[in-house]
């Protein structure tokens, strides 16, 4: 196990998470509402979120939210996919919202430039006001925070929640917006109470050479964020992500003793689908971890699961890396260390 002061590890964002979420709720979400007001004035009826990595997964979650509770046309597209295969419809009734923490992601900047050239409303969500991405967008929000999963998810959710509220109100959207007020306290509770459990699960998972992550519903994008982005980039663990409903269509054939699985189990309508996969796997291997939203939700809406489930996964992945004697901040290639 790596001997390290966790307060020095940039990967671990639990320390200031609650304060950052409180700040975004009080200061930045109203700025999102101002942008949405302009979108409504311009009769925007199609939204393209463009991002990469974790920010893309946050945007995908918001896209699923829109699909579930509205007929709003929302897309979440990877940067180069947007640039290389630019949507046929890109005009003045479209919005292109680029999400990039450092604001230097070239393909996201290029996507905003493409959108602006076609007359689309453009906005950027980034950490700093002087980020390069802000010059490519008509509107920008610099959130000045480090817990990017929570922040990006909150900002993208706020776009969708406000658009639905203004254009086609839905009872569930009102419940989600109301429960968001309780988010800081709920996150704080998990930060305080889940570290030891995360340590135990991280130690267990550190013995596995790779991990299959399985999720469904609103947790699908978080499954990718944790099972691919976090495991590969930060813990140097081989990973693969499977959608719960697709588990029986091929993946079930690799289940056998010793094969490791991590399940993210929500309490939305897709719960039974993931439970079916869990039951199948548990009969054939003991290497199973289940993170269950029902056990940590504190009564919050099922579509807030991606916010809360992040905390157990943050602790698990941090300790997984530490037990593998790896500092999750260490890189071999990423961030310009090697030309790509």
From Swiss-Prot:
Q: Which CDD domains match?
A: SIS_GlmS_GlmD_2
The catalysed reaction is: N(6)-(6-phospho-D-fructosyl)-L-lysine + H2O = D-glucose 6-phosphate + L-lysine
Q: What is this protein called?
A: Fructoselysine 6-phosphate deglycase
Keyword set, alphabetical order? Hydrolase, Repeat
Q: Name one GO biological process term.
A: UDP-N-acetylglucosamine metabolic process
Subunit architecture? Homododecamer.
The top EC class is: hydrolase
Superkingdom of origin organism: Bacteria
Its function, per the record, reads: Catalyzes the reversible conversion of fructoselysine 6-phosphate to glucose 6-phosphate and lysine. Functions in a fructoselysine degradation pathway that allows E.coli to grow on fructoselysine or psicoselysine.
Entry's Pfam families?
SIS
Any keyword Ion transport?
Answer: no
| EC code | 3.5.-.-
Pathway assignment: Carbohydrate metabolism; fructoselysine degradation; D-glucose 6-phosphate and lysine from fructoselysine: step 2/2
Record-linked SUPFAM superfamilies:
SIS domain
Looking at the record, the residues that make up the SIS domain are 35-169, 201-331
Q: Does the keyword Iron-sulfur apply?
A: no
Please provide, alphabetically and separated by semicolons, the GO molecular function terms listed in this UniProt record.
carbohydrate derivative binding; glutamine-fructose-6-phosphate transaminase (isomerizing) activity; hydrolase activity
